């Protein structure tokens, strides 16, 4: 219950303060001291109308109390006990007063409490304050310690804060009763006790709040007119613009953006009178609308705001989870992914609660504008979500985008977005100021119901997928059994499938890693190789089953489900080798049974070991993950990001990028993400545990197929430092031409380093020479740009990034030795089974499902490959074919680095 109340009452304020700090920090380009100043001024200006309304209620209560005081005093003097209570109650009823109204006198304090809690939570542990000096403060994360008397350190700023607070209270309580004065003075000293040893950045913020309160109280005593207040606000914005220009970084290019933003805010403030004049004229021109009725006006506001809250807190999050329920299952503390919706919805309800409170504080005129504004915002949200979805690439199950460069929108797209929003707003306002506005309650009510219906549909889909997941029975009942068997005297074949492993990194890795050079002896790199699709679902069947399972050949078997053909392809080598008496192991098979969480049931029929090693070490992975990314309010990871992702979707295209990337963390966050994503840790842990999973046997032959996704999960430079691999940051910059390539370089380097340790382990146990080792990836990756790629500019007009089509292919044969060799033979990933069975007995050359040899089905004169494929296999269980859109197909022959050998769409170049 306490968590629920915190989420409803406090967390929305925390979000607001956090966002204001994000905006200020973005404005000042990381000058956290100035950001705190702007934060204080900004919050006080934004909250000023709310404070004024609260103080009016407080003043009203004092007037009522003063009017009743003489009679109450007489009653208390004459009557005692129950009789006094009855007489007072009768008197209150006569005056239309209830004792609970006394709480109105506490409204300003009630407003301050959540803002104080939010600011304290954020600024007391903000990483940006550490080692940051500002004005007379050496470190904003520590108490100021400005005065030393002998060995005693005295913090001056809390004392200054208290003095200003007392001065503000003295001005405010002039002519008031002693109890009113005492109340504020006691509160001032309570804050002194609470904040005396707090970070100077936090004390600075609260001191500035008190200064603002003092100035406000002085002007309040002067009884300024609203126009004067408005002029003061404009002057304050002008001053802030000048201060921003002076205190931000000195170069013109660095300060242009903050100054332009502040200037824009000033211009907007200057235009407010004209906007209000337009609104008044519209009200006069269309006087009889639904917004003149208090109840109907509130119903429009409530239904619109509630629709927006449900849309952001339930509809969008449920749609995200429903897109891939298995990825959100058993993750981040959630067993059933439906539990995620509780957090996003309660946070959204909290925002709705505060919006309703604000609405009720204002006069009828302001309520009219707020009601109309709620409808306009809802319309804008729908336009952005459904008409301007954007294509931002892959996103993790913590809702972190993999390639941040894709967040940038073209000016043309953004202009179209803004134009559409403008048109939508204009049409909406025309309706709101016409007689058609009478339909608004019905329209918003229908929208609200439709959002709930959408949530229901998504929830059914999520629950269905979750129940399917719970029924998966992995063939690793002996989970404590070691996953791999390695023969001391027989033959060993290892196939390492590195999901999204990149070919282009091999040379720099060999140049800079001594352990890789020494361990990877006898390897040959096939640089001139090609895959069949951009995604794992379409490429792995051919990798494990050969040419009979290319996307084109799979589509020819149109009377069979894709999932069955996929399972068959992944079963080719296990069935073939196990039936010939080999010891077979297959770990983490890609999308087996079209399940994100490995469903090993298709392997039940074979004599083999099948395990999910990444999940085997899940607990160890979670332990490594849990020590990072904590913040003051405990709402982190998916609990925070889900609602923020919904807000991301609601924003216009280019503002999404600023909202996501503008702060020190993701989604307007002020705390850098310090956790390495769990999928990487699970896959990387499985690599580091390879040697622990080996069971040496004295005789027999062994086939070990090992799928690993470390290369599929690029990590940040900060994560590399966390792993104590700092040298990789500069090494990646030396070879890579963009951040996205650097992030892939990190994980590829780490992968080959761990494989090198495993190969060294095999050598130490005399099992390297009798091993054939194949390292292959299912596909490459778009956006990979490195020094020395002289061929890449030739593909500028290709229409897609050819880098995804070039996979990693390497082999070390039995008894092979020497340095790395390069082979430019034209290869495809479907050659993997041929390489695996090369020079083995004839019975091992045949696909056990078709009866054909791998060699006879080999066809790579012209390779037909797909450069676009729907990758989410959980949505393809009832399909029999991959996409048939001709424009998605590409053709290549002989040399993948020559654009003349490529053709696209319907044109096939011989």
Whereabouts are the PLM-identified features?
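Histidine-centered active-site microenvironments of extracellular/periplasmic hydrolases
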Residues: 524-528, 604, 763-770, 774-817
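Beta-strand elements within well-structured catalytic alpha/beta cores of enzymes
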Residues: 37-41, 202-204, 486-507, 519, ...
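Helix-loop-helix
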Residues: 1-290
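Membrane/wall-proximal cationic-aromatic binding patches
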Residues: 451-492, 502-527, 906-910
């Amino acid at each position: 219950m306490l968590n629920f109340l915190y989420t409803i009452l406090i967390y929305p304020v925390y979000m607001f303060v956090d966002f204001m700090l994000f905006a200020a920090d973005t404005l000042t380009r990381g000058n956290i001291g100035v950001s705190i100043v702007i934060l204080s001024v900004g919050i006080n200006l934004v909250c000023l109308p709310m404070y004024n309304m609260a103080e009016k209620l407080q003043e009203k209560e004092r007037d009522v109390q003063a009017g009743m005081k003489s009679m109450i005093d007489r009653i208390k003097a004459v009557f005692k006990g129950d009789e006094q209570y009855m007489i007072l109650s009768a008197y209150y009823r006569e005056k239309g007063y209830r004792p609970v109204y006394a709480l109105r006198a506490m409204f300003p304090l009630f407003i301050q409490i959540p803002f104080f809690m939010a600011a304290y939570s954020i600024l007391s542990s903000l990483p940006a304050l550490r080692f940051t000096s500002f004005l007379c403060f050496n470190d904003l994360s520590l108490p100021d310690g400005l005065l030393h008397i002998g060995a005693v350190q005295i913090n001056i700023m809390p004392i200054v804060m208290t003095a200003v607070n007392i001065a503000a209270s003295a001005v405010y309580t002039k002519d008031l009763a002693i109890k009113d004065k005492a109340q504020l003075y006691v509160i001032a000293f309570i804050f002194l006790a609470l904040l005396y040893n707090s970070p100077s950045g936090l004390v600075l913020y609260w001191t500035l709040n008190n200064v603002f309160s003092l100035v406000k109280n002085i002007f309040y005593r002067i009884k300024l007119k609203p126009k004067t207040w408005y002029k003061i606000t404009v002057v304050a914005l002008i001053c802030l613009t000048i201060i921003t220009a002076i205190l931000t970084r000195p170069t013109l290019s660095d300060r242009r953006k903050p100054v332009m933003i502040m200037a824009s805010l000033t211009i907007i403030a200057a235009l407010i009178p004209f906007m209000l004049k337009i609104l008044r004229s519209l009200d006069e021109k269309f006087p009889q609308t639904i917004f003149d009725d208090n109840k109907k006006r509130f119903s429009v506001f409530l239904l619109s705001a509630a629709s927006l809250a449900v849309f952001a807190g339930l509809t969008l999050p449920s749609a995200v989870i429903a897109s891939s329920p298995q990825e959100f299952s058993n993750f981040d503390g959630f067993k059933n992914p439906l539990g995620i919706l509780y957090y996003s919805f309660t946070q959204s309800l909290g925002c709705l609660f505060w919006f309703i409170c604000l609405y009720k504080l204002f006069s009828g005129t302001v309520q009219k504008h707020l009601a109309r504004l709620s409808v306009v915002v809802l319309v804008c949200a729908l336009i952005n979500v459904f008409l301007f979805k954007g294509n931002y690439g892959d996103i993790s199950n913590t809702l972190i985008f993999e390639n941040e460069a894709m967040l940038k929108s073209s000016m043309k797209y953004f202009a179209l977005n803004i134009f559409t929003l403008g048109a939508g707003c204009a049409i909406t306002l025309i309706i709101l100021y016409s007689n058609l506005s009478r339909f608004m309650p019905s329209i918003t009510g229908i929208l609200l119901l439709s959002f709930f219906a959408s949530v229901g549909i998504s929830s059914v889909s999520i629950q269905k997928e979750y129940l399917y997941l719970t029924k998966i029975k992995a063939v690793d009942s002996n989970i404590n059994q070691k996953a791999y068997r390695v023969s001391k005297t027989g033959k060993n074949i290892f196939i390492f499938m590195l999901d999204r492993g990149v070919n282009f990194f091999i040379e720099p890795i060999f140049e800079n890693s001594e352990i890789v050079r020494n361990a990877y002896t006898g390897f040959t790199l096939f640089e001139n190789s090609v895959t069949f699709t951009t995604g794992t679902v379409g490429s792995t069947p051919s990798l494990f089953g050969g040419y009979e399972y290319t996307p084109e050949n799979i589509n020819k078997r149109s009377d069979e489900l894709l999932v069955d053909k996929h399972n068959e392809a992944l079963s080719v080598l296990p069935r073939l080798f196990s039936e010939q008496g080999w010891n077979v192991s297959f770990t983490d098979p890609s999308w087996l049974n079209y399940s994100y969480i490995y469903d090993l049931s298709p392997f039940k029929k074979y004599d083999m070991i099948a395990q999910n090693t990444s999940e085997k070490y899940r607990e160890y992975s979670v332990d490594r993950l849990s020590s990072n990314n904590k913040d003051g309010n405990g709402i982190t990871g998916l609990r925070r990001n889900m609602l923020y992702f919904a807000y991301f979707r609601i924003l216009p295209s280019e503002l999404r990028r600023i909202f996501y990337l503008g702060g020190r963390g993701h989604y307007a966050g002020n705390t850098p993400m310090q956790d390495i994503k769990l999928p990487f840790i699970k896959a990387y842990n499985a690599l580091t545990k390879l040697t622990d999973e080996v069971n040496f046997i004295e005789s027999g032959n062994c086939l070990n197929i090992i799928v690993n996704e470390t290369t599929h999960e690029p990590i940040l430079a900060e994560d590399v430092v966390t792993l104590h691999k700092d040298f990789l940051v500069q090494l990646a910059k030396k070879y890579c031409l963009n951040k996205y390539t650097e992030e892939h370089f990190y994980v590829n380097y780490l992968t080959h380093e761990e494989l090198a340790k495993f190969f060294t382990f095999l050598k130490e146990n005399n099992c390297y020479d009798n091993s054939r080792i194949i390292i292959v990836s299912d596909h490459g990756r778009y956006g990979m740009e490195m020094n020395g790629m002289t061929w890449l500019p030739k593909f500028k007009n290709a229409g897609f990034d050819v880098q995804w089509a070039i996979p990693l292919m390497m082999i070390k044969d039995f008894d092979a030795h020497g340095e790395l060799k390069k082979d430019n033979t034209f290869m495809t990933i479907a050659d993997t089974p041929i390489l695996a069975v090369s020079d083995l007995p004839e019975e091992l050359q045949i696909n056990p499902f078709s009866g054909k040899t791998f060699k006879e089905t080999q066809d790579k004169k012209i390779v037909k490959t797909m450069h676009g494929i729907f990758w989410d296999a959980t949505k393809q269980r009832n399909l029999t074919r991959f996409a048939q859109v001709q424009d998605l197909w590409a053709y290549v022959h002989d040399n993948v680095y020559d654009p003349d050998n490529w053709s696209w769409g319907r044109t096939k170049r011989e």
